[in-house]
């Protein structure tokens, strides 16, 4: 899901779970007294407010406050906050993609959260790291998503699934005939291609010892990245990927081929579970395959979070609400309503959640995933990298030439737009 990726996927993920006991910190009687009569506004994702209905009611009763929930597309909320926040019509708590955190913090749109270590320790390392900027916490993980492998059980059984990407290439050579295909992926986009490139040593940004990103160290054109791109190019060059899945509309073509039973397997995310189910496809879901070097294909973890607006006039109570919404009990309840995989570690073994094949696949793949870089400089990577990979896919440039140009363009844009930080 292109919007989710660059806000970015299903995010789907880090291993997660939760126990039934709520873990939000108790508020003192004086704090409760000061909150009496207050009103908080929460911006929740579209068609997801039912997942927090009970939590909101409980919070209202305990704190004697009114909480108004407004649904907005989570990937667009930061845009609305830029206008509505200063105008006094914005939220106290909002939800947003983890890879937007850095930009939001740089623009002064979010409040730093001050929560106890035991609250932070509830969540998977990757998900909580996505909420950190300069070692400061700006959100609590709500849900995770990452890319996984969907396969059509009527075309290929679980036992027949190739174990490596190279084996999928061989399988596709035998089955693709121009109208039907074996394995498909949107490898002309860095969000998906990074799964292959990083397996051979490529990376987006290098990291310092403290885990922070170094935007001056770009690895999308190193030797490993080029090797991964060369493997990707084979799928297009040999006619195993149709031209229709290249470019902005590629995702629609890829999904249609799968729902029409014309592709045995595709890389997608949990955001398509409902659509594929409604299409009547007899599908299975599993983690991504390995590479020939024995490494697992990685993926970006998309993390949705609860954050406190810098414009909130009741930031202490807003933080209480964010902690409450993201606690163990409420995370599990939200999963039961929305099927979004929570980021709480204990959920990794929760039977109620692990009975879902999609949740199991996201949890397993999350072991090999990394958060989408959340620094503002990431905005300068997407377009040059995607453009380069499209020239690789169409055969207009060799991988090294294309990726060298992408890295050079990204470095120039970072210098021009971010050097004054």
UniProtKB/Swiss-Prot annotation:
<keyword id="KW-0732">Signal</keyword>
<dbReference type="GO" id="GO:0042956">
    <property type="term" value="P:maltodextrin transmembrane transport"/>
</dbReference>
<comment type="similarity">
    <text>Belongs to the bacterial solute-binding protein 1 family.</text>
</comment>
<keyword id="KW-0813">Transport</keyword>
<feature type="lipid moiety-binding region" description="N-palmitoyl cysteine">
    <location>
        <position position="23"/>
    </location>
</feature>
<comment type="function">
    <text>Involved in galactan degradation. Part of the ABC transporter complex GanPQS involved in the uptake of galactooligosaccharides. Binds mainly galactotetraose and galactotriose.</text>
</comment>
<dbReference type="InterPro" id="IPR006060">
    <property type="entry name" value="Maltose/Cyclodextrin-bd"/>
</dbReference>
<comment type="subunit">
    <text>The complex is composed of two ATP-binding proteins (MsmX), two transmembrane proteins (GanP and GanQ) and a solute-binding protein (GanS).</text>
</comment>
<protein>
    <recommendedName>
        <fullName>Galactooligosaccharide-binding protein</fullName>
    </recommendedName>
</protein>
<keyword id="KW-0564">Palmitate</keyword>
<dbReference type="Pfam" id="PF13416">
    <property type="entry name" value="SBP_bac_8"/>
</dbReference>
<dbReference type="GO" id="GO:0055052">
    <property type="term" value="C:ATP-binding cassette (ABC) transporter complex, substrate-binding subunit-containing"/>
</dbReference>
<dbReference type="GO" id="GO:0015768">
    <property type="term" value="P:maltose transport"/>
</dbReference>
<dbReference type="GO" id="GO:0015144">
    <property type="term" value="F:carbohydrate transmembrane transporter activity"/>
</dbReference>
<keyword id="KW-0762">Sugar transport</keyword>
<keyword id="KW-0472">Membrane</keyword>
<keyword id="KW-0449">Lipoprotein</keyword>
<dbReference type="GO" id="GO:1901982">
    <property type="term" value="F:maltose binding"/>
</dbReference>
<keyword id="KW-1003">Cell membrane</keyword>
<feature type="lipid moiety-binding region" description="S-diacylglycerol cysteine">
    <location>
        <position position="23"/>
    </location>
</feature>
<dbReference type="InterPro" id="IPR006059">
    <property type="entry name" value="SBP"/>
</dbReference>
<feature type="signal peptide">
    <location>
        <begin position="1"/>
        <end position="22"/>
    </location>
</feature>
<feature type="region of interest" description="Disordered">
    <location>
        <begin position="393"/>
        <end position="421"/>
    </location>
</feature>
């Amino acid at each position: 899901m292109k919007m989710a990726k660059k806000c970015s996927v299903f995010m789907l993920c880090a291993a997660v779970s939760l126990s039934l006991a709520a873990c939000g910190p108790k508020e003192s009687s004086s704090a409760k007294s000061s909150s009496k009569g207050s009103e908080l506004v929460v911006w929740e994702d579209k068609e997801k407010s039912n997942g927090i209905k009970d939590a909101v009611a409980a919070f209202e009763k305990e704190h004697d406050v009114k909480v108004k929930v407004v649904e907005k597309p989570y990937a667009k909320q930061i845009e609305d906050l830029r206008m509505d926040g200063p105008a006094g019509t914005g939220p106290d708590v909002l939800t947003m993609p983890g890879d937007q955190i850095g930009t939001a913090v740089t623009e002064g749109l979010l409040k730093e959260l001050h929560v106890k270590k035991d609250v932070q320790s509830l969540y998977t390392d990757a998900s909580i790291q996505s909420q950190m900027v300069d070692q400061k916490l700006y959100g609590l993980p709500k849900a995770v998503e990452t890319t996984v492998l969907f396969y059509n059980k009527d075309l290929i059984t679980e036992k027949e699934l190739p174990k490596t990407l190279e084996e999928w290439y061989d399988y596709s050579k035998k089955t693709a005939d121009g109208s039907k295909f074996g394995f498909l992926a949107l490898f002309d986009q860095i969000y998906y291609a990074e799964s292959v490139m990083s397996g051979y040593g490529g990376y987006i940004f290098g990291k310092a010892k403290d885990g922070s990103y170094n935007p001056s160290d770009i690895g999308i054109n190193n030797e490993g990245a080029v090797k991964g791109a060369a493997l990707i190019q084979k799928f297009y060059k040999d006619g195993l990927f149709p031209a229709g899945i290249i470019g902005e509309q590629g995702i629609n073509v890829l999904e249609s081929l799968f729902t029409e039973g014309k592709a045995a397997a595709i890389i997608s995310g949990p955001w398509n579970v409902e659509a594929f189910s409604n299409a009547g496809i007899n599908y299975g879901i599993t983690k991504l395959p390995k590479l020939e070097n024995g490494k697992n294909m990685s993926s970006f973890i998309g993390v949705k979070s609860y954050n406190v607006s810098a414009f909130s006039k009741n930031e202490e109570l807003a933080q209480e609400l964010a902690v409450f919404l993201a606690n163990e009990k409420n995370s599990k309840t939200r999963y039961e309503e929305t099927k979004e995989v929570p980021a709480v570690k204990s959920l990794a073994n929760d039977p109620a959640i692990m009975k879902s094949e999609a949740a199991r696949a996201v949890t397993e793949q999350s072991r090999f995933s990394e958060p989408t870089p959340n620094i503002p400089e990431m905005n300068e990577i997407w377009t040059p990298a995607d453009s380069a990979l499209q020239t690789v896919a169409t055969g207009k440039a060799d991988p090294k030439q294309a990726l060298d140009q992408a890295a050079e363009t990204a470095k120039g844009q970072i210098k021009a737009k971010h050097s004054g930080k």
